[in-house]
Amino acid sequence: MSQNLYAQFSGTPMAREDIERLLRTQGYGICSLCDDGTPYSIPISFGYDGESIYLPFLAEGPRSTKAEIVSEGTVARLLVTTISGRFNWRSVSVTGPLRSVDPDTAEFEQFIATLDDNGWFMRGFERADSLDSFQGWRLDPETIQGLERTEGPIE
């Protein structure tokens, strides 16, 4: 790939305030986990409170692959993107360990409030009575990176 062609598709680092804005407004992304070397990625709703990312693990049916893979301290990566064209996109990657949110604590109330504030629930999980499992997890960011491309092609 020529340098000029690469430059047309590569991004530039996002400002911290733009990263924060995307995490607060998008409400959904792709969460990647790893089980014995096999990657597992899923679309997921999330809430962001300015420090932590809250992830609801929801399941319909008797088993949840997410719940089987995750344990306290499992490292996850959340990818959040907006794409409105070939040369107009933003992408934020957040990596860090997962911590369980106990439903009998004040933190669980914070988890629910944050999801209510800026989370976005997938259509398949609109009916709470159809869920067999609901777990709260907190992703503690160790690395947050953002790239964007908001211009037309390079001439």
Go through each PLM region and give its residues.
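Amphipathic alpha-helical interface surfaces
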Residues: 19, 62-66, 107-111
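An N-terminal domain-cap segment
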Residues: 2-43, 47
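A generic structural signal for short beta-strands and their flanking turns/coil linkers
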Residues: 27-29, 42, 49-51, 72-76, ...
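A short mixed-secondary-structure module that forms the rim of ligand-binding clefts
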Residues: 47-84
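Charged, gly/pro-rich active-site loop segments
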Residues: 2-8, 86-155
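A generic structural signal for nonpolar/aromatic side chains embedded in well-ordered alpha-helices
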Residues: 23, 69-70, 115
